[in-house]
């Protein structure tokens, strides 16, 4: 069921510098337990655990990740009982961790808090409100002076204003930004009644006879017809619609969606339209209309990302991943993240990468834990984040689809994985240069290769900083395929490899070596003994299940 015996929680998903952190525990463990606060592998302080709630004041440094853990000593050995990460960042765009919402029926405050507490425990700092709006061309139901209390969404579900605003308020209490979702260019069949002009649409022919549209059959209330973001009239119209939204709802920004490449398109006058080229103009217009609000735009399969969205005023880059090759799928993920880094001059990447996709489209079932964790290990090790958590975990592009459930083991693992990417954000997502690692196992327990992954081997990813190297080991020992999506849910759990004698090339005199893994010790780091011989060190990796991070610190 995913119940965690000793669960640590914090009152927020992220903190402003100088803000105190409130920590709490569901159960008080027996015996002498110590609370330990760390930044990376450096212990900042330790205090005895005396109760189920307390507060901590981190340093006022901005953009820092911390790990807090509870440990006890048994027979001279340290045993970690629980941990939680803390992100101190004045702006979530520095380390975005996206979640979503997809249902807005009548909900009590208690029900809303249950969903948001779960996102909060995963340190989600941006929440995108999928399918919340009334109509694509008129997102607000009613008017700013008389907003509707209940409206029908695109599939005729009831949406409650009290639920949408309740979620926004709950997010703000937890340090999360709320982004409302909408297409850049969508209009429903009744748009003329709401002031959308015929000349604003995109057409499949030069004589404005056939509008381009996204077909949606019953129970959806309308197809979605495409408008032309190149037109200032449409941009002004949408900016006004969004102003109406902001007057009623305390949203923090707009998550802009698109539908990928649409083939040949023409405007009303028969001129050819390069759809991707319209995105920067649209984003810029939305930013000018509301300079204080955050913007993000989905690049479907990277459509419109390079030189266009990537250079626009968006908080971070967001890619919906559709390429899923069976034999080198994981390099699709790393290529997207490294391209985005380069194209945007270092903005972070969030991937909408839907797991166990075929399984999710077939009906009720469970996510395949190894598939999900292998995808997350790869995305996180390359410095990305994975949009996957909401009221349920995502399996398809229709966000309300909750056909697949998470097993208890996956629920538990997700908590630690999110602690890991938050606690070690300064290594995973904060500078450094990727490099090719030279590493091998001297005891024959593993075969090591540089990224990309090879079945039955361990893949390494290196990141070099001024005075440290970070080396990720990702385990593909039993992989039956290398498709990140694990579409049919057939991926096999890797073998646990313990105390592996490892040889790694280094660039200078080594001061300390430490390791951390989301699969062991609740992600808490441990220092390791090592021997240096010239430009090599020998070190025993304590364990490798899915992903272990080795950190080499230099003098």
Regions picked out by a protein language model, each given a short descriptive name:
Residues 81-135:
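An acidic-aromatic substrate-binding cleft motif
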Residues 90-96, 102-109, 180-249:
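Active-site-adjacent "subsite" loops/lids of carbohydrate-active enzymes
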Residues 95-109, 145-161, 219-236, 265-278, ...:
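The substrate-binding groove and active-site-proximal loops of carbohydrate-active enzymes
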Residues 115-116, 120-162, 186-201, 205, ...:
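Aromatic-lined carbohydrate-binding/catalytic grooves of carbohydrate-active enzymes
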Residues 230-316, 322-334:
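Active-site neighborhood of glycoside hydrolase catalytic domains
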Residues 347-432, 477:
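Aromatic/acidic polysaccharide-binding cleft in carbohydrate-active enzymes
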Residues 445-507, 548:
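Carbohydrate-binding surface patches
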Residues 533-555:
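C-terminal beta-strand-rich structural cap/linker in extracellular carbohydrate-active enzymes
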């Amino acid at each position: 069921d995913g119940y965690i015996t000793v669960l640590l929680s914090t009152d927020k998903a992220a903190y402003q510098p100088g803000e105190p952190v409130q920590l709490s525990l569901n159960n008080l463990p027996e015996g002498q337990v110590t609370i330990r606060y760390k930044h990376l592998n450096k212990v900042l302080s330790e205090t005895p655990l005396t109760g189920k709630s307390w507060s901590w004041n981190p340093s006022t440094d901005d953009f820092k990740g911390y790990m807090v853990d509870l440990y006890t000593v048994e027979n001279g050995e340290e045993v970690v009982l629980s941990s939680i990460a803390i992100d101190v960042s004045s702006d979530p765009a520095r380390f975005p961790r996206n979640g979503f919402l997809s249902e807005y029926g009548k909900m009590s405050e208690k029900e809303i808090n249950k969903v948001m507490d779960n996102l909060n425990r995963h340190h989600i700092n941006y929440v995108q409100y999928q399918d919340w709006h009334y109509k694509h061309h008129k997102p607000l139901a009613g008017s700013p002076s008389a907003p509707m209390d209940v409206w029908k969404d695109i599939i005729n579900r009831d949406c409650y204003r009290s639920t949408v605003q309740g979620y926004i308020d709950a997010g703000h209490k937890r340090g999360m930004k709320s982004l409302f979702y909408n297409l850049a260019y969508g209009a429903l069949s009744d748009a003329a009644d709401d002031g959308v002009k015929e000349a604003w649409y995109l057409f499949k022919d030069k004589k404005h006879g056939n509008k381009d549209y996204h077909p949606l059959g019953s129970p959806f209330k309308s197809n979605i017809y495409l408008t032309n973001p190149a037109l200032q009239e449409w941009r002004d119209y949408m900016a006004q619609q969004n102003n109406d939204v902001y007057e009623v709802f305390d949203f923090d920004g707009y998550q802009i969606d698109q539908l990928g490449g649409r083939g040949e398109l023409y405007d009303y006058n028969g001129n050819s339209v390069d759809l991707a080229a319209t995105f920067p103009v649209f984003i810029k217009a939305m930013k000018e209309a509301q300079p204080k609000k955050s913007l993000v735009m989905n690049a479907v399969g990277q459509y419109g990302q390079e030189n266009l969205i990537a250079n626009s005023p968006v908080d971070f880059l967001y890619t919906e991943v559709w390429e899923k090759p069976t034999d080198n799928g994981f390099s699709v993920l790393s290529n997207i993240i490294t391209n985005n880094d380069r194209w945007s001059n270092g903005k972070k990447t969030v991937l909408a990468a839907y797991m166990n996709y075929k399984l999710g489209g077939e009906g009720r079932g469970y996510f395949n834990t190894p598939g999900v964790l292998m995808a997350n290990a790869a995305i996180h090790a390359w410095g990305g984040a994975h949009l996957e958590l909401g009221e349920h975990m995502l399996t398809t592009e229709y966000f309300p689809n909750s056909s697949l459930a998470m097993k208890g083991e996956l629920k538990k693992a997700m908590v630690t994985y999110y602690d890991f990417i938050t606690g070690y954000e300064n290594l995973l997502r904060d500078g450094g240069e990727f490099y090719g690692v030279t590493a091998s196992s001297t005891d024959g327990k593993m075969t090591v290769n540089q990224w990309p992954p090879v079945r039955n081997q361990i893949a390494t990813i290196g990141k070099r900083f001024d005075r440290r190297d970070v080396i990720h080991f990702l385990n593909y020992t039993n992989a039956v395929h290398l498709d990140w999506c694990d579409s049919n849910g057939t991926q096999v759990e890797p073998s646990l490899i313990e105390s592996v004698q490892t040889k790694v090339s280094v660039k200078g005199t080594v001061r300390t070596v430490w390791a951390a893994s989301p699969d062991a010790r609740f992600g808490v780091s441990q220092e390791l003994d090592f021997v240096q011989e010239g430009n090599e060190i020998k070190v025993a990796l304590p364990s490798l299940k899915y992903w272990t991070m080795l950190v080499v610190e230099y003098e």
